């Protein structure tokens, strides 16, 4: 089997490079044909030229997101993806049972076993996401982090942006429709569109999402202050958000989001993804069975 290894050398203070080298050795020892590339230099043309059956991504969620951006609609579903996590949150790996500290020999066995499943993706204009997108406080924090980022990030990288955003939280007044039905009408709050259950700090606002059901899960939490954001964080942590006043949870094929007053930051898979412009609704659609991942184990929270 031909396997491509994509390595984000900035991830994990060099851990991704070490892990990638170990996986390359293990794959060769187990009979695989292997090509290793730096993720930053791996063009779609280079991937196609190698013609891999599987791709091992050594890095964080951003590295997986970059691959999805490159290859959605260009043959992504033909390659079985395994995430060898060395990032900050590693939500993709967590969702699909690709846990950290798995030895290179075991990663090689999982990949060469050639057992996979198809998952959905979310599409918003020219961008796509595997995990989630959101509008609100968290997206504004991500935007702040990306604006000052100079290298790898850790959880501490978010501390100052969170504090600064909390002093004057960006909570847009939104209108939201799912498959044509209005579920939020001119309320301020946080909106998450999830393809999977996982979210940063295990808050998991779309805790019932299934990445293979052909639908996207939506959670809206009404909020107009930093204290209400803290309250929602606590409710999500305890998996009690669904029963709280001000929470709307639904799912569908197409979600339309409109910011009514001012520009609102958007994030996808933990990466800044521009802004919603008043008067220009954003439309998010599900793309069923658009990505293939290594089948490891049943999902766990």
Positions of predicted regions on the chain:
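Catalytic core of DAGKc-family lipid kinases
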Residues: 4-7, 21, 30, 35-38, ...
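ATP/NTP phosphate-donor binding region
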Residues: 1-58, 65, 69-70, 106-108, ...
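Short acidic/glycine-rich loop or secondary-structure boundary segments that cap or lie
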Residues: 138-141, 184-186, 199-202, 226-230
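A generic structural signal for short beta-strands and their flanking turns/coil linkers
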Residues: 170-172, 187-189, 212-217, 251-253
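Glycine-rich phosphate/pyrophosphate-binding beta-alpha loops
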Residues: 134, 138, 192-207, 272
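ATP/nucleoside-binding phosphotransfer catalytic cores, i.e., glycine-rich phosphate-binding loops
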Residues: 178-185, 210, 220-301
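Gly/Ser/Thr-rich active-site loops/lids in small-molecule metabolic enzymes
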Residues: 149-157, 193, 201, 207-228
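Short glycine-/acidic-enriched loop or helix-start segments at secondary-structure transitions
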Residues: 16, 66-69, 92-94, 202-203, ...
């Amino acid at each position: 089997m031909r396997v491509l290894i994509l390595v984000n050398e900035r991830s994990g203070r060099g851990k991704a490079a070490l892990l990638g080298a170990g996986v390359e050795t293990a794959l060769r020892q187990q009979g695989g044909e292997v090509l290793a590339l730096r993720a930053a230099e791996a063009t779609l043309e280079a991937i196609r030229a190698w013609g891999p059956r599987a791709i091992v991504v050594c890095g964080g969620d951003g590295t997986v997101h970059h691959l999805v951006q490159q290859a959605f609609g260009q043959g992504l579903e033909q390659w079985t993806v395994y995430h060898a996590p060395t990032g900050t949150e590693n939500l993709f790996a967590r969702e699909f049972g690709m846990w950290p500290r798995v030895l290179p020999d075991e990663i090689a066995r999982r990949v060469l076993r050639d057992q996979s499943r198809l998952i959905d993706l979310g599409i918003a204009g020219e961008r796509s996401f595997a995990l989630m997108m959101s509008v609100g406080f968290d997206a504004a924090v991500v935007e702040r982090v990306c604006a000052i980022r100079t290298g790898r990030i850790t959880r501490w990288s978010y501390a100052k942006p969170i504090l600064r955003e909390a002093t004057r939280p960006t909570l847009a007044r939104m209108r939201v429709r799912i498959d044509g039905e209005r579920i939020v009408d001119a309320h301020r709050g946080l909106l998450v569109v999830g393809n999977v259950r996982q979210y940063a700090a295990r808050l998991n606002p779309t805790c019932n999402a299934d990445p293979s059901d052909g639908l996207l899960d939506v959670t809206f939490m009404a909020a107009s202050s930093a204290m209400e954001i803290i309250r929602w964080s606590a409710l999500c942590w305890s998996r009690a958000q669904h029963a709280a006043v001000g929470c709307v949870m639904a799912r569908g094929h197409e979600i339309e989001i409109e910011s009514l007053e001012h520009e609102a930051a958007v994030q996808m898979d933990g990466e800044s993804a521009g802004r919603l412009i008043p008067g220009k609704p954003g439309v998010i659609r599900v793309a069923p069975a658009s990505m293939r991942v290594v089948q490891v184990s049943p999902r766990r929270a």
